[in-house]
Amino acid sequence: MKFYGYRRADGSVGCRNLVAVIPSVVCAADVAQAIVQNVQGAVGLFHHQGCSQLPPDLKRVTDTLIGLALNPNVGAVLIVSLGCEGTDYARMFQEIQAAGKPVEIIGIQKLGGVSKAIAAGIDAAAGLVRKISGQQREEADLSEVVLSIKCGASDATSGMASNCALGYAADKLVSLGGTVIFGETTEFIGAEHILMRRAVNQEVADRIGFIVNWMETRAKSLGCDMRKGQPTPGNIEGGLSSIEEKSLGAILKSGTSPIQGVMEYPERVRTSEEIKKGLWIKDTPGREPEILTGMACSGAQIMM
């Protein structure tokens, strides 16, 4: 089966052809937003990170922003740097450039302030839009699709209808050679043993058990019980009685394919060393902004 998309220099195929304007730190977000508002065809990938964080957190933010920039739906990138942030904006530029994707960078402090940076950014973003606007869609195989799947407003019918349909779609794409990612580690509780039985080997099974136990351990270290937050009031109103019942419905969206492995939050499907195929778990929170960002960072062109 085929679809039509935008072939990238790294071999991936996008369903969209957007210029992403990415602030390297929250302090540059207003400038990035002003640029996006003045350039048709540009989208802003705003966030509240990048400063006054510990080194492991800053590395994760940098890795995530690089992953978002390398998503196949992004045709070109403008990085908006402040100049004194903790994130590694130079590495962002280098890795995006090394992947063959058109990229520009502006520095607010280096340019002499906000107004000059906005003007320079508008020029740069508009130039990138012009640069990629002539690219045409071409035929690609469905095996090049990376699909991410997530629950939405779970209720008593999720495990009987919507998640079953998602599971069928996931199995179909895997059978065609594509990649499917699912996450929401908080919604594996009580059903992790079922996922572990679907692992391709014992190492993957152990990893699935570990991420669930580690998530619960972190909550307990703060004096919290995950079962006090799950299921949510909306889930209960919809007919769910426990986190175990919610999890049993949630995991149905992954279908029945063998689970190939567990990906860390900023980990990407496509790297210079490999292209992950089949069904994968991504260790993520259940909250939409975090999980959807993580899925886009992995390279998902489509989210359901």
Segment roles from a protein language model:
Residues 1-150, 154-304:
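Metallocofactor- and cofactor-centric catalytic cores in central/energy metabolism, strongly enriched
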